[in-house]
């Protein structure tokens, strides 16, 4: 297995940025789209619950319909080559005795994992569906981070979008997907200009060593 050296890793991490405008003439190859989809699919999650569904939007008309309900992100989404709609599963789908969880794992992993997960629902969440929903969103955001970093490693760009009307976007997608519950959007494409210098808190404000 080959790894990037430290200098290259640092360069890629610094070059990754939230791209606010994409090259509207750039078109993803089928290989690029498949690779992005696989990056998403392989994302880690607590208990390997994978409580998500990724909708890869490449249809321009559909993408623009979504953009129309994305407030100040409209122009940026319209310029993107593709849009990932990150949908979260509903809390009821993660109940240990439900169809999804019962069919997610193979034995003997299933029995011990579902037992441990049920204990977590009791001890950490006190069987609160609201807390379970927050847990599901946490897992989705882990996947979002992996997608954005993975796309950067491909030499491409992304922008995480939280500013959109979830109900309206859901209505657009509901014509093709049954009752989607949307966590966030990720615009994908190729930048039209170089990013400004990355701005982050100094190390001593961001990190504590013990």
UniProtKB/Swiss-Prot annotation:
It comes from the Bacteria. NADP(+) binds at residues 150-155. Keywords: NADP, Oxidoreductase. It holds the Pfam family Nitroreductase. PANTHER family: NAD(P)H NITROREDUCTASE YDGI-RELATED, NADH DEHYDROGENASE_NAD(P)H NITROREDUCTASE XCC3605-RELATED. Reduction of a variety of nitroaromatic compounds using NADPH as source of reducing equivalents; two electrons are transferred. Belongs to the nitroreductase family. This is Oxygen-insensitive NADPH nitroreductase. It comes from Helicobacter acinonychis (strain Sheeba).
């Amino acid at each position: 297995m080959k790894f990037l050296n430290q200098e290259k890793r640092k360069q890629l991490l610094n070059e990754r940025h939230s791209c606010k405008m994409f090259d509207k003439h750039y078109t993803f190859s089928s290989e690029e789209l498949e690779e992005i989809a696989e990056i998403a699919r392989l994302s880690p999650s607590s208990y390997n619950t994978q409580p998500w569904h990724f909708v890869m939007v490449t249809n321009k008309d559909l993408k623009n319909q979504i953009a129309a309900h994305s407030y100040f992100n409209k122009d940026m989404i319209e310029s993107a080559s593709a849009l990932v709609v990150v949908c979260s599963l509903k809390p009821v789908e993660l109940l240990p005795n439900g169809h999804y969880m019962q069919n997610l794992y193979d034995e003997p992993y299933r029995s011990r994992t579902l037992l441990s997960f049920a204990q977590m629902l009791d001890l950490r969440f006190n069987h609160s569906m609201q807390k379970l929903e927050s847990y599901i969103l946490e897992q989705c955001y882990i996947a979002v981070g992996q997608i954005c970093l993975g796309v950067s490693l491909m030499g491409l760009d992304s922008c995480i979008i939280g500013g959109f009307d979830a109900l309206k976007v859901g209505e657009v997608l509901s014509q093709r997907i049954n009752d989607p519950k949307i966590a966030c959007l990720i615009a994908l494409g190729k930048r039209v200009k170089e990013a400004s210098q990355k701005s982050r808190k100094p190390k001593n404000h961001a990190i504590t060593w013990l």
